[in-house]
Design a protein with these regions (language model features):
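A conserved short coil-to-beta-strand element within the FAD-binding core of flavoproteins
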Residues: 1-12
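Conserved active-site beta-strand-loop modules that form the wall/rim of enzyme catalytic pockets
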Residues: 9-11, 29-31, 40, 76-80, ...
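Short beta-strand micro-motifs in enzyme catalytic cores
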Residues: 9-11, 54-58, 144-146
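Short beta-strand segments that buttress and anchor functional surface loops
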Residues: 12-18, 183-186
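Central helical "cap/lid" subdomain
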Residues: 15-74, 103-107, 120-126, 213
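Short glycine-/acidic-enriched loop or helix-start segments at secondary-structure transitions
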Residues: 42-45, 98-100, 158, 193
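Active-site lid/adjacent beta-loop-alpha segment flanking the redox-cofactor pocket in flavoenzymes
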Residues: 65-177
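C-terminal catalytic lobe of FAD-dependent flavoproteins
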Residues: 126-236
Length: 236
């Protein structure tokens, strides 16, 4: 990004404070970009093929028999136990949509999904909607896995993994230069469960501590995986 200047050891971030004309500069050892769906507006993520995904969740009032629900019901959608008299019922999945207004058609989609999945239960009659809902945008990746780790320029990846683009195996593991910019993103629909572990992966890597995942799992969330896959697909 144009507001970020990096050297081999340090990073400078320039930004304007709200309603202020003066520019403030922060210098740090490392910058972690955790921008959610806002990452699509940053050129630092251009090579990662990420996309925003809109989701709408209904907040339906509780009543018998769902007032006794004490676990999350999961199928193609989900419904949670009541909190303050309401159940969360969701969620829609609309790719490349950054809008957050509540839509009646998505309410109907959510209700229909649950009515179909729970058709033979007494719960169906309790799925009464009174217009309360919210929508937000999460960030998704092509393989639906989180994206965690250092952000490298595509030209750097291309030079280090050049053998892949001509269909030849790598004779040794490429050594990428240290990056002072990393990301923790694409937590998708299940971020509450993946965020703590992914944060531990990133912090352990930065602090050179033992990593909490196997190599296979680390490769599955590595920031460079989309670029290397593209190089393999483009073999000449």
């Amino acid at each position: 990004h144009e507001a970020i200047e990096t050297t081999k050891q340090r990073v400078q971030i320039r930004f304007n404070l709200d309603s202020a004309e003066s520019e403030e500069v922060i210098t740090a050892d490392h910058l972690i970009l955790a921008l959610g769906a806002g990452a699509i507006n940053s050129e630092d993520f251009n090579s990662l093929s990420l996309r925003p995904v809109r989701g709408q969740v209904e907040a339906i009032p509780t009543q018998p028999p769902i007032d006794g629900l004490n676990t999350v019901l999961c199928h193609k959608g989900y419904m949670t136990p009541a909190l303050e008299g309401r159940h969360a019922l969701g969620s829609t999945y609309v790719k490349n949509d950054l809008t957050t207004e509540v839509r009646n058609e998505e309410t109907e989609t959510n209700l229909a999904t649950h009515e179909q999945a729970l058709a033979n239960t007494s719960i169906v009659q309790a799925l009464q909607h009174d217009g309360k809902a919210r929508a937000a945008t999460r960030l998704g990746s092509p393989d639906h896995q989180p994206v965690v780790g250092a952000l490298h320029n595509f030209d750097v990846i291309k030079s280090q993994f050049a053998m892949l683009s001509v269909g030849k195996p790598l004779t040794s593991a490429p050594l990428l230069p240290n990056s002072v910019v990393s990301t923790l993103t694409c937590l998708g629909s299940r971020g509450l469960t993946t965020a703590p572990l992914m944060a531990e992966v990133l912090v352990s890597s930065l602090c050179k501590e033992p990593l909490p995942l196997s190599n296979d799992l680390l490769n599955a969330v590595n920031t460079s995986r989309f670029m290397t896959r593209e190089m393999i697909r483009s073999q000449s």
